Structures are given as structure tokens and as C-alpha cells.
């Protein structure tokens, strides 16, 4: 089930397409609306379709959580797949041990830059949560592209993003933005690695990597990266 918006629909369709390519079967692909007080009808329809696991492409503090709780309460499902919008400490805390064994994914990498940003975050006293690395890197890429273009006009600096993001050039990690700007100002090249192991392909899409999450002992634990 997916939240009824562009994010949810696109994610659900992508999951179904790729899962079926691997030989899996999807029994139902149904939307749910956010902000409802009761999801028993939605859970009943999902349960009737059957399946070994329920994919909940929603939000952990909204309908997604309530669908999981209703599924557990009625015995409809006991194992869930949780995309990025459902990953957060509040969900296993709210659901408890019944969520153990569920799995999920979240953009992430075990690259050296990821640890560097994590250490910086801890030293500064803030939580390095989901999408922190990607947000940090997006801001850094824009700043470096502005420097390379000599302009803050998006029409001008967008042409420089690929140049500062990829090789050739000196590798740039979290905390080294000042160094990068000096290199660019001096006519040199940079290859921004950042916190999320940046590598842009095609028209500027991120090649991407993700963390594999397992809910265990009432907590989200990272068990691998791909």
C-alpha cells in the first residue's frame, strides 16, 4: 500500500516493477489516504489479497504507522517492508517488538565521507538522520557550481554541477568545502565525493547507494549497504 501522492505512487510502481523482474509476485498495489482515524477497511482489502509481506510506502508518523498497527492487531500481516519514508526511530518505539523482523531501505553509504559527516554531526551536537548526507551534498554541489560559474544564477551554474561532482579533480570530502572553493577559484578541478559518495550519471541523476535496514530488538539496525 502506498500514500496517495506522486511520491507514494512512483515508489510503489518502482518496487512492483523491480520485484516482478526478479520473479516475485505482487498481490495488490493499493493507495491509502493520509489523515484518517481508522484504516481497518484498507487493511481488510490488503489481507484479502494475501501475501507474505506488506510493503508500506507511506510516512512513519501518519497513515503508514496506523496501517501497520491495524495489520498487527487483526493478524493480517506480521512482517513489513519499509521504504525510506517509514524509517525512523519513532516507528519501532511506537509499535514495539511486533515490528521485529521487518526490513527496509534508506539512502546511505558506508563510504569514508559518511563517517566523516557523522563525526562532524556528533561534534556539533545534532542528529545525523535520514537524508542528512544527501542534503549536505546537494548544498555543497550548488555552492561549488556557483563558484565554477562565477554566478548565482541557476541557469548559469547548473551547467557546472556535473563538472564539480565527478572526476577528474581533487577528491573533496565533508568539511572541505572551503578547500574546494579555493581550488576552483584558482582554475583547478575538483571531484566531490562528499558524504554520500557522489557520482552523477546521465542528465545529473545520482548513481546512488542504499542501506539495508532490519528491525531488531525494537530498533532499526543497518545490516549492509548496496
Annotate the PLM regions.
Residues 1-226:
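Extracytosolic ligand-binding ectodomains
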